[in-house]
Amino acid sequence: MAGACVFSLKLFESPDALLRSALINDSKQLSAESRESQFTVLESLQAEGLIDFAVAFGSVAEICERNILGATRLAMQRAIEQLAQQADGWSLPQVAAADPLFKAASEVKVIVDGRPLKSFPYAHEGVIKGDGKSLSIAMASIAAKVTRDREMLRLAEKYPVYGFAQHMGYGTAAHRAALIKHCLLYTSD
């Protein structure tokens, strides 16, 4: 109900990266403290050149205009484009409109948590409950959650009456009540 974040990850083949990421799990299964700790591991792996990742947001205005899935697709596309700019020589082939939504596993360049996305310009494969099945998706879920939570804590300081520090903008009863009480229906922050 407040904010959106998507994360994209490129994992380089590295036994060290895999070993050091052994505690990474679905972000929903980790405490906030554990997520922060694992995000620090991801940042270290990136600094050492073992993985590369990008975080991108879908804005409140984009959610209102396109719905949450449309804004998420847009943020995913932005993250992929950021990765392409960061990594020399790395790119994803775009899918023509007539192509199927996803390619054979050997050709897949992007995996997403959930079902394959309609109207997404990159070859991809959906993995249901992927954050519990794929290290890359689990890493992505941690980075997305940590980044989003940090943004919500920033907004909590700016708008304390909404209780973002407690519910992080998710649709809890307390969040809905604060929205109704304080009449905040839309902001572009």
State where each predicted segment sits:
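RNase H-like, Mg2+-dependent phosphodiesterase core
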Residues: 1-188
